[in-house]
Amino acid sequence: GHPAITTAGDLLFGISIDEPPEGWKIPNPEKVKSLVAGLIDGESVRVESSVENIPWIISSDLPISEKGSLSIKVTEKSIKKGERHLTFHPPVLVLGVGCERGVTGNELIELVEKTLGENQLARESIACIASIDLKMDESGIHQLADYLNLPTRFFTNDELESQTPFLKNPSDIVFSAVGCHGVSEGAAIAAVGRGGSLIVEKTKSEKATIAIAKSTSDIDIHKFGIARGKLNIVGLGPGKVDWRTSALTDAIKDSTHVVGYKLYLDLVEDLLKGKECFFSELSQEESRARKAIKLASSGHNVSLVCSGDAGIYALATLVFELIDRENCDDWNRIQIEVHPGISAFQAAAARVGAPMGHDFCAISLSNLLTS
């Protein structure tokens, strides 16, 4: 054999074989070099695809021929050991999940692994997990998503009920429980759209059901359903950059939306590039908390910025009080993470020395948010 410089393939054929589009996976990357070497030597390539739309391959300058001596295979099917084709797994599958409350992640994982194996499907081709919004806070589903390293998307019962004509196994029992005739099949079909198809019908375990649908092209998860929203409640400390926690920095960087008192947002201005920001003046704490909760309940990743520590005379308590008081389904389902910060009393104590080395009591001198 001889070495093949893959950048030569980029220059000659207008395609980066070893860097496919986002979401595509190569299960046998060791085949890349030999294929590129053959192309450089003048050989043609045969393309076998189970997916209709593969423009990044077809529109390239690859010497594609039905009689090519080299081969590229595009498939959602798992490959056998020793597969001779260079294989690509495109993101064209959606895993629909329905379950009873309290199902374990392990039960879901075992059901998915068993079903994928029986149907010879590659987990690398699954673009996301889809379900009904009633299950947005179901820990078992999120454990499955973490295990598969996949995003989740959720639909309302009305959206899933509109898929009833396309279900293979509609259920009146499911309808009486959640308001649609099928969750796993309905969610999978809703995600892939009308051009897609159900390729694995509802499959059951004791407390869960799954189904798998296939799209005709790459799945864009931003075009359907909503994600489970996340609300980060972050304390920025006394204001000095070097007294911020790394958790605060990461939370704001990962957020799409940031809410806070104008002065507090000014203190983290270096982290706000590309974020949608909402601010209000002092004494409007409840409106800020409500805004942050509503944004998160719409599927966004939100940071609510407080001074000091978010849980000490700050907005974390107010957020939990509002959610408890309103008892709104959309609000109850969001993921909340409180990130601690350095409180002003800790900063003042550090300037003095160590006055709080033993038991102590903190008393607020303000009648705002503490009465």
What name fits each language-model region?
Residues 2-43, 225-230, 329-337, 343-371:
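Beta-strand/loop-alpha-helix module characteristic of Rossmann-like adenine-cofactor folds
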Residues 68-81, 85-88, 185-220:
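C-terminal edge-of-domain segments
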Residues 87, 91-108, 112:
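Glycine- and Gly-Pro-enriched alpha-helical subdomains that act as flexible
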Residues 112-126, 243:
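Phosphate/pyrophosphate-binding loops at sites that engage ATP/ADP/AMP, CoA/4′-phosphopantetheine
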Residues 142-143, 148-178, 185, 226-339, ...:
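Class I S-adenosyl-L-methionine
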Residues 19-89:
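Accessory alpha-helical/coil subdomains and C-terminal extensions
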